[in-house]
Curated annotation (Swiss-Prot):
Organism annotation: Tityus obscurus
Tissues where this protein is expressed: Expressed by the venom gland.
Subcellular compartments: Secreted
Protein name (record): Toxin To58
Entry annotated with the keyword Amino-acid biosynthesis: no
Main location: secreted
């Protein structure tokens, strides 16, 4: 969850 929920949630 670094970029608003992009990357899957990282």
């Amino acid at each position: 969850k670094k970029f608003g929920g992009f990357l899957x949630x990282i």
